[in-house]
Amino acid sequence: IVSGARNLIVNEHGLNKINVFPVADGDTGTNLALTMKTILKKAQKDDHTNTTMSSIAKAAIENAYGNSGMIFAQYLNGLAIEIGSRTQLTQEEFVLATQNAVKYAYEAVSSPKEGTILTVMKEWSSDLKNHVSEEFETLLERSIENAKKTVDNTKFKLKVLMDNNVVDAGAKGFLYFIEGIYQYVKTGILDESHFKAATMEEHVEIIPNTDIGELRYCSQFLVQTEKDKEYFTKLMTPFGDSLVVSKRDEYVQIHIHAKQPEKVMATLVREGIVISSKVDDMQLQANLLHRRKSPIVIVTDSIADFPQEFAEREQITVIPLNLIVDSTVYLDKLTMTPEYFYKHLDDYRMNPTSAQPTQEHLERYLTGLIEQAESVIGIFVSSKMSGTFNNIVRNVNSLNVTKKISL
């Protein structure tokens, strides 16, 4: 798993370049890489296979990013469930677990489509089963060769992939993951310097349709609740599309492309404890990637209280502050709008407060901007008024970037 995760992480940027499905927001590589990084950071290794896999699944479900990251997490969760209480696995048991895990990934998606990461998961596990009697290293090598063909064929499964002459980014990400596993089986090397980004096939510049439409907000919510996955799938369906719902223990992770994430949040708060949330403006992401007005991009935080129309017109990225209302953390102007805030002000049990964005949120925003632009200008209030400025500086320094960044 570690080797697979590291091999996927080093290919983050290449995956972003070919990301056009389900929307051309150019962040599939980043979302998968962040999911893998969190697994490496939070999962605990144990001598027993079931304990290790359970820890990996928990970290994945609770910290997955994006559509493909959520599907990947549910696949790992299914793998942990299928391993069950086994402390060690035979080759046959491993192959059976990988095959049975696929159904968990499919069931998490409200409208599963072929030609995506799901297809590669299914075909890879089927190929393992068909050649299960072979030596393990040979088995993996053969299955990966067939997985490559499956990935290549994704461009003929979905029109948007065919139109842009690219394979599905999520499917390619899963291929990098299983290639990393094979590298470790073959060499036994886990050192990070061993993993190199693959050479990507040159493509004519991808210019996809960048009109995202009304469902422009890629939204994720982690909810602690006793209610089951099916309940939340039915509850969330009216709010948007690209719905993925996964559950492990008492935690439900929800991914949805929504028009009004604040309404999704208001609904979920009534159903359990919302542990965390993430909202990305896919229209802005698509514009910055494919229709950027300037080589310089501007980033600020939601203290800069200017109209949304102005931010959209000038393609300004606004990092939301955290608003804490009755012990629940909201994203300023995204999962908590000013209209909703003031309408319910008299209903709050405690005085609302604010907090800086987390380091993980800052890293995610800055990584995407730095990748897309030639230069980045960050405009924030003074460090004496808010700690966000100093946190931004620390985050930029930790990224070791070579591009020009002005704060």
Could you tell me what each predicted segment is?
Residues 1-407:
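N-terminal loops that bind phosphate or other acidic moieties
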